[in-house]
Amino acid sequence: MGLAAEQAGLSRQPLADRVNGKNILCGLAAGQAIHSAFAAQAEIKGSPNFLTGRFGLNAIFAGGNADLEKGLADLGKKFSVTETSIKLYPSCRSTHPGLDLTFDMMADEPDLANRVDTIEVTSSKIVNELVGSPFKPGKDPRVAAQFSIPYTLSVALKRGKIALSDFD
């Protein structure tokens, strides 16, 4: 059921649950966009009221109170694809600022790893909930490590880099 929900694109819960299903979220969304474009080209009709209808997304997710005018103001004008990027590290994006800072400090002080006993990271509540807990391998150690500031910063300090193989 969890994989079915992830394919519907309705939840980011796999991130919180630390399951590898999170790895397919973006690909599934992109695939559905392509399927939808082909379906539209074949004149298959989707609901015109998918946002505003009684059972539309506004009703389901915002209790009918979403500001759709504001939300749709840039539709067809602004294309977010220009705001995307390739992640520099094979871990949750929320670990990246800490990794950037660690690598910057190591560039200035190459022996930093030998002098550090503890690292204190301050972040927003949501980032802390997502990646700030002590590292616990759990049922899926790879995903747990990818969503752990303690793990990723420790690896960065010890190895001077972080690579996909650090999560095997």
What is the predicted function of each stretch?
Residues 14-17, 21-31, 38-168:
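Terminal-appendage/accessory-domain detector
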Residues 1-13:
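Conserved catalytic cysteine-centered active-site region
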